[in-house]
């Protein structure tokens, strides 16, 4: 009974009946790790897509996608900022509104209407700058907003209605291999027979945008589980390990959050009201039926936090 290493003999050439043992060396197995540091955040914001999970790594990412921290209840930025200061750096953020959010818009010289690509009050800080283009008899149009890289559309030619048509086409589709479509606004050509003039046109003189937060509740943050999913349910299949609904202190929504955590293997962080006491917290928790490894109910007064963005 020969014992050999695997591959040392040609088994197809063996002609003598016998028992042959081959030693098979151990194989190297590659194990892919599963991240456990992804935090799902749901709350309100002044800019950005609604109901669309967006990856954020730090506060610069957050500001670029959702605008600044806002000093109000249910604000998503406040939750992200406090988590970042404690070392977190991997978020999936979902913006919610009450359905009344609107996008800022501005009509320039009767020739074109610019509308912010997202709803929210941050769009009110947009500005459009007209100046001479690099080529003769052309115009350069710059779209700027605080916290965003200015978008420059150069060498837009034409006069009268032709210019406004060319401008709208450049903004909506790009005007070169290095200048794609705008990520801040969309343009609507009004076919006006007017010519552009140099200057700065601010959205503060147009139709203001709104955040849609006037009637937000904890139920709004929970959202709906039908397509397109909104609120908490937009975190499905996003790989989150932790989940937090900003300031969702309504105990009638805790069991729903817990059930979602169980279904998605997410550890849900539940929020109690500010200024709560032990006796009330125990009673409310029992009435809500929260008793699961998939949820943690935070007790205690809400923290005092130095908001350096709003200086409060």
What are the functions of these language-model segments?
Residues 1-312:
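A glycine- and small-residue-enriched flexible loop/hinge signal that marks low-structured segments
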């Amino acid at each position: 009974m020969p014992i050999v290493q695997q591959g040392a003999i040609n088994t197809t050439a063996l002609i003598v009946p016998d028992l042959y043992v081959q030693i098979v060396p151990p194989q190297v197995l590659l194990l892919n790790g599963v991240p456990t540091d992804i935090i799902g955040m749901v709350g309100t914001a002044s800019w950005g897509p609604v109901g669309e999970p967006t990856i954020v790594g730090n506060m610069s990412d957050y500001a670029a996608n959702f605008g600044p921290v806002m000093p109000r209840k249910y604000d998503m930025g406040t939750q992200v900022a406090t988590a970042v200061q404690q070392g977190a750096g991997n978020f999936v953020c979902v913006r919610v509104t009450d359905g009344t959010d609107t996008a800022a818009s501005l009509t320039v010289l009767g020739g074109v209407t610019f509308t912010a690509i997202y709803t929210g009050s941050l769009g009110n800080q947009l500005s459009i700058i007209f100046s001479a283009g690099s080529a003769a008899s052309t115009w350069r149009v710059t779209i700027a907003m605080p916290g965003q890289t200015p978008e420059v559309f150069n060498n837009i030619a034409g006069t009268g209605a032709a210019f406004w048509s060319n401008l709208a086409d450049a903004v909506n589709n790009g005007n070169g291999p290095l200048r794609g479509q705008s990520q801040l606004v969309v343009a609507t050509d009004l076919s006006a027979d007017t010519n552009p003039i140099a200057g700065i046109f601010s959205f503060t003189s147009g139709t203001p945008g709104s955040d849609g937060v006037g009637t937000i509740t904890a139920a709004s943050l929970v959202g709906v589980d039908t397509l397109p999913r909104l609120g908490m349910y937009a975190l499905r299949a996003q790989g989150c390990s932790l989940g937090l609904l900003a300031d969702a202190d309504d105990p009638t929504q805790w069991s729903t959050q817990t059930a979602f955590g169980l279904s998605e293997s997410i550890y849900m962080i539940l929020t109690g009201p500010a200024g709560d006491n032990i006796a009330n917290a125990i009673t409310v928790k029992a009435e809500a039926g929260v008793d699961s490894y998939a949820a943690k109910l935070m007790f205690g007064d809400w923290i005092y936090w130095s908001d350096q963005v709003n200086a409060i």
